[in-house]
Regions:
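N-terminal ligand-binding/catalytic initiation module
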Residues: 1-158
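Glycine-rich phosphate/diphosphate-binding loop of Rossmann-like nucleotide-binding domains
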Residues: 77, 84-102, 160, 168-250
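Acidic, His- and aromatic-enriched active-site or binding-groove loops in soluble protein domains
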Residues: 163
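Conserved small/polar residues in nucleotide/adenosyl-binding loops
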Residues: 252-255
Length: 255
């Protein structure tokens, strides 16, 4: 991995126009006619078409190519709960990746709300603007509830990147690695060092590919997650092992 200094990173974000993303027009705007089509009076016609048929928004606006990257800053990369505004550079960075690799337009939205219900309400109210929602850097277990609720209440795709993006990439790596060494995915034993959103989602996808639940050992900050431990959330309970002989990753006990 390339080593990046603090000075270089700050200079990158500060130089020229601060930040990493911007909005650019996609239609002509040089003449009075252009502006009259883009705004008043011409803009009234697509508005009325959308009023008659909401799906027309995909024909006359950028809705279909516009994704909201939304976070409350409670689990930002390796920084933890640093707050919504502090996470903005990460959300802009994700917007940059959407654009350069997928041609998808992004608005980064930082919501200063930790309560899952209120956070969902905020997203639901702005959802008509977008063709998709990318949830980003929201801590577990709240992120599981938020994603499931928004999938139920919204009529556009909802993805929690820390769960599903990570899971897809790591599952591809696992599948290819097992193919290279000639091992059956149904017979391998898997140790998952972590029990946050990414780890939970990754492990569920590994199981969908064939990893057997009884062959999984998952750890969190307190050690191996066992079924006799109190205070586990529902996600951790699902992966808790019934083994009573193992609480750490001592080689002898794992073997």
């Amino acid at each position: 991995m390339v080593k990046i200094s603090k000075e270089a990173a700050l200079e990158y974000h500060e130089s020229g126009r601060p930040g990493k993303i911007e909005v650019k027009p996609t239609k002509a705007y040089r003449t009075q006619t252009d502006l009259s089509l883009a705004y008043s009076p011409g803009v009234a016609y697509p508005c009325l078409e959308i009023q008659d048929n909401p799906d027309a928004a995909y024909r006359y606006t950028d809705k279909g190519n516009l994704v909201a990257v939304i976070s409350n800053g409670t689990a930002v990369l390796g920084l933890g709960d640093i707050g919504a505004m502090s996470g903005k550079p990460v959300m802009e960075g994700k917007g940059l990746l959407f654009k350069i690799y997928g041609g998808i337009d992004v608005f980064d939205i930082e919501v200063n709300e930790k309560d899952p219900e209120k956070f969902c309400e905020a997203v639901e109210k702005i959802a008509p603007t977008f063709g998709g929602i990318n949830l980003e850097d929201i801590k577990a277990p709240e992120c599981f509830y938020i994603e499931e609720r928004l999938k139920r209440t919204l009529d556009i795709p909802v993805m929690h990147d820390d769960q599903h993006g990570t899971a897809i990439i790591s599952a591809a790596g696992l599948k290819n690695a097992l193919e290279v060494i000639g091992k059956d995915i149904k017979k391998v034993r898997l140790v998952v060092n972590g029990a946050g959103a990414a780890a939970i989602s990754c492990t569920k996808l590994y199981m969908a590919l064939g990893v057997q639940k009884e062959n999984i050992l998952m750890l969190d900050s307190k050690g191996v997650i066992t079924s006799d431990r109190e205070g586990l959330n529902e996600q951790k309970k699902f992966f808790a092992t019934d083994r009573r002989d193992i609480h750490t990753l001592d080689r002898k006990s794992v073997v």
